[in-house]
Amino acid sequence: MPWIGLDDTDTLSGGCTTYEFHLLITELSRLSDLGSPWGLPQDTRLVRLWPFASKRTRGNAALALKIDVLEGHENSLLDFLEGWYASLKKRISELEVVQSNHSERLQHSPEPCLLYLNKQFPDFYWKAVRGHVTLEDAKKTVLEDPLSKIWSDEKKMSGLIGSLAAISWKGDGDCTWELTAYRRIENYLTKRRISNESVKMMSNKYNKTLLNRDPNSKKPLISPNTPCPVLYGIRAENDIDALNAHDYLQSFDENEICNSHQIWRTNQATGDHIEKRYRGVLNSNPIILKGGHIYLEISGISDGVNEEILMAFEESGNIKQLANDLKKGDTIEWMGLRCPTGEIHLERLKLVKATIGNRKRPMCVCGVRFESSGKNQPLRCKCGKTFPRLWVGEKRDSSEWKEPSSGNRRHLSKPLNRI
């Protein structure tokens, strides 16, 4: 059964790949109902990719769907997609490229790609969600399907990577769902109207929804702050709860009424971008950097790597607090993502075995502290008494896993309550 994928249609000033794909889904469905030789779109999905990709889009998400075409009528679908892509190019050519005031990442003009395939390439998805892949990698993979079709600018087609990855994601190990609600055109330039209280009530009523509010600030997390058509996105463990939660929000008079909505199967909150957890020992006490970030030097790592540098950012909350309290010699476990400069950005941290705090030699009954008398020798006091070699001090307990708050985590990060 054929697949259609799309990526890279937005900038910080506007545009929205999910909305463009929603329009495509809507039109494919309308034409199917009118007798066009294809079925209704299936398995509509939103797939997040490697967070450090150099030309990643605003949310670094790509879209795909599966569609059944009557045998011998594939060209009818391809002709439709040709025309749709031409209209898409015209729309996004009017977008302005502005630079971010909260990120040093250079913004680029959109490099949209619409992709038609007859097969999936799961290995490519795993490469694209966990690390850097080149455009040449994507082109080479697509050529393995002789029936593939690419619509893109030959010299500007970075969207091919996301389109191919979205199609290639299986999601059979884990997945979540998102309902994205879109605004009415007349509301685009106005402030989004979704009451905090309604989001709180929705979260309590539908406990299979995910990451709706920041537990610390109590602020809703479902609405973006960018000038895009999205009103809000509700994430959930299943599509039914996402839809019911949406209907519930729309029932509040004070909330903005949406124009339309789309349900996606997603890899959000699955942790797909991180392969495994690691264990190691701190070489030195934590180093506090400018901005309150914590720098950890680790050795004795479980997979045989000699040393690693871990970064706990100020915004990571509980992770940063635990990192700050660590001591040289502590054994920790962590999960995180290696950035292009080599450091690992922590997404989860756990103290496994703590060293003794304020470590000292024990006191002799005479009131003087024992001292070492040499390697592998018992401790000795000036009064002549000896004592087994040991340290005394403050016992520090191990910890449970720590993670950032809901408002300071990556789209892909898997919350502890999903494990």
Q: What are these model-predicted stretches?
A:
Residues 44-65:
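Short, charge-patterned binding micro-sites
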Residues 74-271:
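Long, hydrophobic alpha/beta structural blocks
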Residues 350-418:
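Cys/His-rich short segments
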Residues 317-333:
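Short nucleic-acid-contacting surface segments enriched for D/E, G, S/T with interspersed K/R
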